[in-house]
Amino acid sequence: MDNKRHQTSIGSELSEAQNRLSTVGMRIRQRIDRGYAYSGKNVSGMDDQVPIRDVASTIVPQFRTQVLYEQQQQPQQMHRPAMNGPAPMLVNQRTESSNLDCMQEEMLSNGKRRVF
């Protein structure tokens, strides 16, 4: 009798874990939609009124807003890849597994197509 109760409790725990796992995607989307508002609690200790840009270096130490600012000041020097053609198909063709390498090479050469 005790063994049967133990099996039932294990089964219910497993069922509960499966239910939680099946709803993880929905819970992630809800958190994003709410802007990571954790039920009124401020988990990180930061004020909600502070723009994320002002605390980005605290969250991600490598984050620098100055890089964007410098690029906006000198737009003529920015490299913009030419995206004139469609994206490559991700299928196994010949000896390559995809055409991503060819696309990257094309973008790096300013969109000038090379004849092979």
From Swiss-Prot:
<protein>
    <recommendedName>
        <fullName>Damage-regulated import facilitator 1</fullName>
    </recommendedName>
</protein>
<feature type="compositionally biased region" description="Polar residues">
    <location>
        <begin position="8"/>
        <end position="22"/>
    </location>
</feature>
<dbReference type="GO" id="GO:0005634">
    <property type="term" value="C:nucleus"/>
</dbReference>
<comment type="function">
    <text>Mediates the nuclear localization of the ribonucleotide reductase.</text>
</comment>
<feature type="region of interest" description="Disordered">
    <location>
        <begin position="1"/>
        <end position="22"/>
    </location>
</feature>
<comment type="similarity">
    <text>Belongs to the DIF1/spd1 family.</text>
</comment>
<keyword id="KW-0963">Cytoplasm</keyword>
<dbReference type="GO" id="GO:0005737">
    <property type="term" value="C:cytoplasm"/>
</dbReference>
<keyword id="KW-0539">Nucleus</keyword>
